[in-house]
A protein has these predicted regions:
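Glycine-centered hinge/linker elements that transmit conformational signals in sensory
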Residues: 228-257, 301
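Conserved N-terminal structural module of periplasmic/extracytoplasmic solute-binding proteins
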Residues: 1-116, 421, 428-451
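Hinge/lid segment of periplasmic solute-binding proteins
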Residues: 37, 41, 45-51, 115-167, ...
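Extracytoplasmic/periplasmic substrate-recognition and gating elements
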Residues: 251, 286-358, 387-390
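Short helix-initiation/N-cap motifs at beta->coil->alpha
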Residues: 90-99, 186-191, 254-266
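Extracytoplasmic "Venus flytrap"/periplasmic binding protein-like
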Residues: 77-145, 151, 173-181, 270-271, ...
Length: 451
């Protein structure tokens, strides 16, 4: 039993009731009703100094209310006293940002935005942070891979707050009983899967475009040609990797969909790939198998030089500043403060104390990660995978990439199409959309190259 709060007070006198009169109750109810038209329920906090409130930096937090409240508290406690910059913090859903920006009612700074910074940058709606003189020193706080998706036309339009990537989880007890070791490569995983299958067990590998792209990077294949004018999924190397990827599900019986947490817990799926945040979830939700499983870097691809490339894809949530802000310098000061190790460490400690270990904050700041609650052995394994991260650089029309790679996968696995034919068909569709979007934004296309 955990006691959160304890209150001591004098013994109350029972039988005494305090009731407001009719007119007081009526006046209070009317006041509540009228206030419902003017109260901003999204507002978490405003500038402490009323004289500065009209000049307050407007910050939207696209996360839960608990997270927004912590941002507000840290801002009032640390940022405003040090800089003198008043800040108004609102808890607003990320889905509201686009419509508010179009209407000219958007914020100055957006915290915990989705990985959509590129789309705002492409439409000149995001402020280029790399134009600030001290940007390089601020960007050095992060792994290079976490900045890739925040770049457009040579400029950076956001800074990462959180960094996520996948790792491998395996049951040490089950593999030991079967005389197996954790796989280092995909080929080793395939060999292990046959033994597991004979024992009515399976392997959990996400059947998504991201898994294919990850394997593509591990094998040394390029995704784009001519600086993003078109994709290279129809090359021999890319098709070979795609064939290997689809064979996981066609030939080796890997499940297409599954609930990893419970299957891993029961032992039905003793090996699987999931975001490294799964580590905390398993420790909380499956205490009966504590000490019987481990987390390790992803299986990789054995290269010609004898080294194993186990690149994982990095996913970030970012902080950005909108281009129509009237307070760019103040906004930059806030972003620098918020992405610094002190603020990130404080936020991580606060959020874990409120929501528990399963909600541990995965800060993109390298120093804040070192300050986190992970123990030494856990940090060592995570850092090993962090040293092999990459990301897909966003391009105009990039939304078509994941969609059509998944369509190509379905056409092979569900409809029996040839991997080669599927990749030729859907690569053509992707490249056509790339050309269309590049024309829309006045960029060079494949057709221009042909001329």
């Amino acid at each position: 039993l955990t006691i959160k709060n304890m209150h001591l007070q004098k013994c109350l006198t029972f039988g005494v009731h305090f009731t407001a009169g009719f007119f007081k109750q009526f006046a209070f109810s009317v006041g509540e009703y009228l206030a419902s038209y003017v109260t901003d329920y999204e507002l978490i906090g405003t500038a402490a100094n009323a004289q500065l409130s009209k000049k307050a930096l407007n910050v939207w937090v696209g996360a839960g209310r608990d997270q927004a409240q912590i941002v507000r508290n840290l801002t009032a406690k640390s940022f405003t006293p040090k800089t003198g910059i008043a800040v108004s913090v609102k808890n607003v859903a990320s889905t509201s940002l686009l419509s508010a920006t179009v209407a000219g009612m958007g914020p100055d700074v957006v915290v915990r935005s989705s990985p959509d910074v590129f789309n705002y940058a492409m439409r000149s709606a995001a402020y280029p942070l790399s134009e600030f003189k001290d940007f390089e020193s601020v960007a050095s706080r992060f792994d290079n891979a976490s900045l890739i998706t925040l770049k457009y036309m040579g400029k950076y339009y956001g800074l990462p707050e959180t960094l996520s990537f996948e790792m491998m989880f395996y049951r040490t007890d089950i593999l030991s009983d079967l005389g197996l070791e954790a796989p280092k490569t995909w080929d080793e995983l395939i060999k292990i899967s046959s033994v597991l299958s004979n024992n009515n067990m399976s392997v959990g590998i996400p059947s998504t475009a991201n898994t294919y792209i990850m394997m593509l990077m591990q094998s040394g294949n390029e995704i784009y040609g001519d600086s993003g004018m078109y994709t290279l999924f129809d090359t021999v190397g890319a098709i070979n990797v795609f064939t290997k990827f689809t064979n996981f599900y066609e030939n080796y019986g890997f499940p297409l969909s599954y609930e990893f947490q419970n299957r891993f817990r029961s032992g039905e799926m003793p090996i699987g790939v999931a975001g490294y945040e799964m580590y905390n979830t398993l420790q909380i939700a499956a205490p009966e198998i504590n000490g019987l499983w481990k987390m390790a870097p992803l299986p990789g691809t054995l290269r010609e030089n004898g080294e194993i490339n186990n690149t994982a894809l990095a996913t970030v949530a970012a902080v950005m500043m909108l281009s129509d802000t009237k307070m760019p310098q103040e906004g930059w000061e806030f972003i620098k403060w918020w992405t610094d190790s002190d603020a990130q460490t404080s936020f991580a400690d606060e959020i874990e104390s409120i929501l528990g270990k399963s909600s541990r904050y995965n800060s993109a700041n390298c120093t804040a990660f070192e300050n986190s609650s992970w123990n030494t052995s856990e940090k060592t394994v995570i850092k090993e995978q962090k040293s092999s991260l990459s990301a897909v650089e966003p391009m105009p029309g990039g939304y078509y990439l994941e969609r059509n790679l998944n369509n190509a996968f379905r056409s092979v696995v569900y409809k029996g199409a040839s991997p080669t034919d599927a990749m030729y068909e859907y690569t053509y569709k992707i490249n056509s959309e790339f050309t269309k979007k590049r024309k829309e934004f006045g960029l060079k296309t494949m057709e221009d190259k042909g001329e």
